[in-house]
Every structure is written in structure tokens, then in C-alpha cells.
């Protein structure tokens, strides 16, 4: 209850204070100031005496605003002809003063000191005439003569001299120079040129010839050497290569041949055996022995028959990506289509030219133990999920 009364009393006090702000006075806090400002308009004739203001505390109240104006030069006497018509008299006086000021500005300035000299001076004469100038100057002389010109010029000199001539001409130069000589002579040309050089040299000679070429080259060398020879030939190649080697080697040989292949295989040593993978006359005992040697660990290289069967299985799935390994344990093969042959129909792909092959090796082979182990683990996981 007391709280409500306190709030009501405070709000009533504030309401009453807001209604009667004009009658508040704070004793010594009142401050009165009178401003007397003199202000002239643009013509400089009207004087203002204004702005009398009173201030009370924080509230600013203007109780009076006095504005008195009078005209400067105004006379209350009856003799003044402008007394009855103040504004018209002011305008007339103002125009008269402005007219007198303009006339004063227009008056020419005269030199009060009399200057001796010719009274008929040319008004267009040059005021900066040289007092030491030659009085006998040729009136027809060139006004644009170079002041730094040579005073000892030859009077018989050629008047048509080339203005762009070389000023540094050799005075001892040959006067009988060939007028048809090449003006673009190489300034860096060799001054020690052989005077007996061949004048019919090949104009199409190679300008980038090797300056360190062998001067003792074989003069009987083949002039029709292969222009497409490999420029990156091995500089350390065997100089004792077989001169009777087969010049018709297979250009489509596999560039990815196994570098660790066995050099003692029967079908490769001494050029014996058959090289075709599908040759029906292949030594059957050779393949049989190879299969029997690695039957237990399944680590033998994939045979041609295995590769052919694998290609038939994945023929419809071949792409430019490597296929999965053909085996799950041991050595197998992966196949993909070469990027350049990707647009060919799959039934027209060539085994040698359109397919890439590589050997893959599966290290971890599946066994019965692995299958049982995986089954037990799966059962344990399922039982844990469903029983809980």
C-alpha cells in the first residue's frame, strides 16, 4: 500500500511540474542577458538593434524581441528633401555614389614628369630595342637567323647540303666508295674473313651447326641418313653390337616387358623355341613342368591360356581402367584398353596393339581358416546386436 502511495505522489509531482513550467523560478539561478548587435545589410545603410533575451535556469523563454531599424544618414530636420520619402532618397544617393566611384576608376594615370624624346614615337615600336644594335642592319635580313651560327661560313658552300648528314664523317674516307654498296653491313662482321673463301657458299646452310663437330668426319658417310632418327639415342650404347642383327625387329614389341624375366628359359635362349603365344607347336612339356613347379604355392606367372580365358570373361567389361586381378591368390593379370583405342568396338580389339597388360600378385590367400574365422566373427556380432 505504501509503495502505491509513493508512486502516486511522485507521478503527481512530475505532472504538476510539467503543467506549470512557466511560473517556476529558481531564485539566484536566473540570468538575464541583453545582446545589442549592430548589423548592416549589403548596401551598408540599415542598422539593426535587436535581440533582447532573458534566460531562466534551464528553460529558455523569449519574453521580448525588439527590432528597431533606421537609415544611416537620415535627418529629422525639415530642410532634408528626403525626410518624407526616406527610401527613395537612399536609392538616389546610392546610385550617385556608385557613379562617382566608377568615373574615378576610369581616369587614366598620367606621368607627372615630362620625359624628353621624340614626340612622334611609333605606338607599335618594340619597347625592348637594344641600344647597341647595328644601325646598318639589312632590312631584308632573315629574322630567324641562328644567333650561334658560324660567322666564317664558306660563301661557296653547297646550299643543298643534306640536313640529316652524318656530322662525324671520316675526313680520310675513300672518295670513290661504291654508291651501290650494302647500307646494312653487319658492324660485327669478322674483319679476318678468308679472302679465298668459296663465293658460292650454300645460302641455305644450317646457321646452328655444331661448332664442336668432328673435323675428321667420314667423307664416305651415308648422305641419305634417316632424318627421323632418334635424337635421344643412348650415348653409352654398346659399340660392339652384332652387325648381323635382325633389321626387321617387331615394331610392336611390348615396351613393358618384365625386366626380371628369366634369361635361361628354353623358348628364349639362343633364339630357339617358338615366340608366338598361340603357336600350336609349343613344347607341351615346358608348360606342364612350369605348372607343376608352382602348383603348391600358385605363384607361377599366368599362362597364355589363362590370359585368353580371362579376356573372354571380361571382354564386355573392358575399359580404360585396370580390371580386377584375374586370381584371388598368387600371380594373375590385369588388363585395360589403351587410351588411343577406347573408341574401337570391343570385338575388334587387337590383343597386342589395343590392350595393356600387367601382372598382379595377391599376397594374402583365402583359406578354410579365414572362412571359419570370418563366420565366427559375423555370428558374434549378430548375436551381440540382437540379444542386447
UniProtKB/Swiss-Prot annotation:
Keyword Cytoplasm: yes
SMART domains linked to this entry: TSP1
Region (37 X 4 AA tandem repeats of N-[AV]-[ND]-P): 120-263
Location(s) in or outside the cell: Cell membrane; Cytoplasm
Keywords, ordered alphabetically: Cell membrane, Cytoplasm, Disulfide bond, Glycoprotein, GPI-anchor, Lipoprotein, Malaria, Membrane, Repeat, Signal, Sporozoite
Taxonomy, superkingdom: Eukaryota
Covalent lipid adducts (GPI-anchor amidated cysteine), residues: 365
Propeptide, chain numbering: 366-388
SUPFAM superfamilies in the record: TSP-1 type 1 repeat
Region (Disordered): 71-302
Gene Ontology CC annotation, any one: side of membrane
InterPro entries noted in UniProt: Crcmsprzoite, Plasmodium_CSP_Invasion, TSP1_rpt, TSP1_rpt_sf
Post-translational changes noted in the entry: During host cell invasion, proteolytically cleaved at the cell membrane in the region I by a papain-like cysteine protease of parasite origin. Cleavage is triggered by the sporozoite contact with highly sulfated heparan sulfate proteoglycans (HSPGs) present on the host hepatocyte cell surface. Cleavage exposes the TSP type-1 (TSR) domain and is required for productive invasion of host hepatocytes but not for adhesion to the host cell membrane. Cleavage is dispensable for sporozoite development in the oocyst, motility and for traversal of host and vector cells.
Lineage: Eukaryota, Sar, Alveolata, Apicomplexa, Aconoidasida
Polar residues composition bias: residue spans: 265-280
Required for the binding to heparan sulfate proteoglycans (HSPGs) on the surface of host hepatocytes, as annotated region: 104-111
Region called Region I, residue ranges: 112-116
Domain notes: The N-terminus is involved in the initial binding to heparan sulfate proteoglycans (HSPGs) on the surface of host hepatocytes. The N-terminus masks the TSP type-1 (TSR) domain which maintains the sporozoites in a migratory state, enabling them to complete their journey to the salivary gland in the mosquito vector and then to the host liver. The unmasking of the TSP type-1 (TSR) domain when the sporozoite interacts with the host hepatocyte also protects sporozoites from host antibodies. The TSP type-1 (TSR) domain is required for sporozoite development and invasion. CSP has two conformational states, an adhesive conformation in which the TSP type-1 (TSR) domain is exposed and a nonadhesive conformation in which the TSR is masked by the N-terminus. TSR-exposed conformation occurs during sporozoite development in the oocyst in the mosquito vector and during host hepatocyte invasion. TSR-masked conformation occurs during sporozoite migration through the hemolymph to salivary glands in the mosquito vector and in the host dermis.
Cross-referenced PANTHER family: SPORE COAT PROTEIN SP85
Annotated ranges, domain TSP type-1: 313-366
Gene3D superfamilies: Thrombospondin type-1 (TSP1) repeat
Topology within the bilayer: Lipid-anchor; GPI-anchor
Native source species: Plasmodium reichenowi
Bias type Basic residues, positions: 95-113
Chief location: membrane
Stated name of the protein: Circumsporozoite protein
Amino acid at each position: 500500500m505504501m509503495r502505491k502511495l509513493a508512486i502516486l505522489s511522485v507521478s503527481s509531482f512530475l505532472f504538476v511540474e510539467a503543467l506549470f513550467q512557466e511560473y517556476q523560478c529558481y531564485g539566484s539561478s536566473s540570468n538575464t542577458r541583453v545582446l545589442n548587435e549592430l548589423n548592416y545589410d549589403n548596401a551598408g545603410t540599415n542598422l539593426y538593434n535587436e535581440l533582447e533575451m532573458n534566460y531562466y535556469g534551464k528553460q529558455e523563454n523569449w519574453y521580448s524581441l525588439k527590432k528597431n531599424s533606421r537609415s544611416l544618414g537620415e535627418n529629422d530636420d525639415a530642410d532634408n528633401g528626403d525626410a518624407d520619402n526616406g527610401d527613395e532618397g537612399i536609392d538616389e544617393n546610392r546610385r550617385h555614389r556608385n557613379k562617382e566611384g566608377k568615373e574615378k576608376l576610369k581616369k587614366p594615370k598620367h606621368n607627372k614628369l615630362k620625359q624628353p624624346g621624340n614626340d612622334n614615337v611609333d605606338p607599335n615600336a618594340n619597347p625592348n630595342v637594344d641600344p647597341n644594335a647595328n644601325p646598318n642592319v639589312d632590312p631584308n635580313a632573315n629574322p630567324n637567323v641562328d644567333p650561334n651560327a658560324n660567322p666564317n661560313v664558306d660563301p661557296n658552300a653547297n646550299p643543298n647540303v643534306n640536313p640529316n648528314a652524318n656530322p662525324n664523317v671520316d675526313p680520310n674516307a675513300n672518295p670513290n666508295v661504291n654508291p651501290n654498296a650494302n647500307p646494312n653491313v653487319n658492324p660485327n662482321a669478322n674483319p679476318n674473313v678468308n679472302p679465298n673463301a668459296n663465293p658460292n657458299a650454300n645460302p641455305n646452310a644450317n646457321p646452328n651447326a655444331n661448332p664442336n663437330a668432328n673435323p675428321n668426319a667420314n667423307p664416305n658417310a651415308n648422305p641419305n641418313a634417316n632424318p627421323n632418327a632418334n635424337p635421344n639415342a643412348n650415348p653409352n650404347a654398346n659399340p660392339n653390337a652384332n652387325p648381323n642383327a635382325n633389321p626387321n625387329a617387331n615394331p610392336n614389341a611390348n615396351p613393358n616387358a618384365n625386366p626380371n624375366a628369366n634369361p635361361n628359359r628354353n623358348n628364349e635362349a639362343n633364339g630357339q623355341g617358338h615366340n608366338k603365344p598361340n603357336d600350336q607347336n609349343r613344347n607341351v612339356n615346358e608348360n606342364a613342368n612350369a605348372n607343376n613347379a608352382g602348383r603348391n604355392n600358385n605363384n607361377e606367372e599366368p599362362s597364355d591360356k589363362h590370359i585368353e580365358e580371362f579376356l573372354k570373361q571380361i571382354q564386355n567389361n573392358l575399359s580404360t581402367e585396370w580390371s580386377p586381378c584375374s586370381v584371388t591368390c598368387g600371380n594373375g593379370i590385369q588388363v585395360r584398353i589403351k587410351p588411343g583405342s577406347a573408341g574401337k568396338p570391343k570385338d575388334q580389339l587387337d590383343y597386342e596393339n589395343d590392350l595393356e597388360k600387367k601382372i598382379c600378385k595377391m599376397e594374402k590367400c583365402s583359406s578354410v581358416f579365414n572362412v571359419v574365422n570370418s563366420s565366427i566373427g559375423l555370428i558374434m556380432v549378430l548375436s551381440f546386436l540382437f540379444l542386447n
